[in-house]
Amino acid sequence: MIPLSVPNINGNEWQYVKDCLDTGWISSAGAYVNKFEEAIQNYTGVKYAIACMNGTAGLQVSLNLAGVSSDDIVIAPNLTFVATLNAISYSGAQIALIDVCEDSWQMDIDLLQNWLANNTT
């Protein structure tokens, strides 16, 4: 088997995992989730921060809070993880895929500008 990624566990991680298992808080709540949310609040200076179970859930929450619905088109790079497109699809919006630059693998700004010029008013 070729591993997708090799875990890098050092420092206090073993103790943190043991704490979670000992307390029974191994999912979406508990002291470490609260500490993480507070740290994000302090770091970003926002009033609220919510930890999500995965990136897909975070994207879905973000799209929902932005008011994205079936009347919208969401632009995304064509080179992305499937969760990006799944979250957009779940919102009901249409997806417009824009190709990426060969040298950076980021969305090609020229193609984006062309798409916007031809598809928006």
Language model features: what each stretch is:
Residues A29-I73, A87-S91, L97-D99, N118-N119:
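Phosphate-binding glycine-rich loop
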Residues T80-L85:
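Conserved coil-to-alpha-helix start sites within the AMP-binding
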Residues M1-I26:
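N-terminal "arm"/small-domain region of PLP-dependent enzymes with the aminotransferase-like
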Residues D103-T121:
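Active-site phosphate-binding strand-loop segment of PLP-dependent enzymes
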